[in-house]
């Protein structure tokens, strides 16, 4: 029974993770190819908010959050049948991260785990979630490096989980999820070491982008 419930959780979580929020929102909400029109950088995000406003950004993030919450909740409900809801949620987070980073339908060319794993940490434990969020925000606002903030937050997720969570399988799954996040950011790590990583700053006035 447990193996069957884990299998269902894995399939659903991986499937939802592998769905591209960019492509989905392009077709359902914005009716344009936002991946092509608005690249994931300073200028692209600035132009996106300028064109679609805060409501457009909220719709995009809401869709991304819903896509993450469904497998997390389902994993907890299914494994809750055998009194292991915590393992089900952690397993869903891990499988969802795999789907995001290695989506088979996009030839294993994935996207970012930042929101999905961020929400997943609160399912592991509120203390884990808040500690992870605080570290992410602190490192980001101190350095403006999103990749560095993600890596620091991931390390904090692991540390607090090891300190606060008693279930061994949950700890293992969190560590495996962290491994996926580090693999996702392997190129960013290299750029950080070489000092070539770009900082992210949102600015309402985008005229500076065209300065010589």
Model feature map: region roles:
Residues 1-10, 72-91, 122-128, 161-173:
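Helix-coil boundary and interhelical linker segments in multi-pass alpha-helical membrane proteins
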Residues 12-26, 59, 97-107, 140-145:
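Transmembrane alpha-helix interface/packing and boundary motifs in multi-pass membrane proteins
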Residues 24-57, 190-212:
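Cytosolic, membrane-interface loops and tails of multi-pass inner-membrane proteins
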Residues 45, 49-52, 75-78, 95, ...:
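Interfacial segments of multi-pass membrane proteins
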Residues 56-59, 66-105, 127, 136-137:
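Nucleotide and nucleotide-moiety/phosphate-recognizing core
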Residues 129-131, 146-154, 165-177:
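Loop-to-transmembrane alpha-helix initiation sites
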């Amino acid at each position: 029974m447990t193996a069957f419930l884990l299998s269902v959780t894995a399939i659903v979580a991986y499937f939802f993770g592998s769905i591209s929020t960019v492509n989905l929102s392009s077709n359902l909400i914005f009716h344009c190819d936002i991946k092509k029109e608005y690249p994931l950088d300073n200028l692209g995000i600035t132009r996106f908010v300028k064109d679609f406003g805060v409501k457009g950004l909220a719709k995009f993030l809401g869709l991304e959050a819903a896509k993450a919450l469904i497998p997390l909740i389902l994993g907890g409900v299914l494994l809750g049948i055998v009194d292991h809801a915590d393992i089900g949620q952690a397993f869903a987070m891990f499988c969802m991260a795999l789907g995001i980073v290695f989506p088979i339908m996009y030839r294993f060319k994935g996207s970012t785990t930042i929101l999905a794993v961020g929400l997943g940490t609160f399912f592991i434990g509120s203390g884990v979630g808040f500690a992870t969020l605080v570290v992410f925000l602190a490192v980001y606002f101190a350095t403006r490096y999103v990749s560095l903030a993600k890596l620091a937050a991931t390390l904090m997720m692991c540390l607090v989980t090891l300190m606060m969570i008693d279930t061994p399988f949950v700890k293992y799954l969190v560590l495996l999820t962290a491994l996926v996040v580090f693999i996702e950011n392997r190129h960013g790590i290299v750029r950080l070491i070489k000092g070539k990583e770009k900082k992210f700053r949102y600015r309402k006035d985008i005229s500076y982008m065209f300065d010589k």
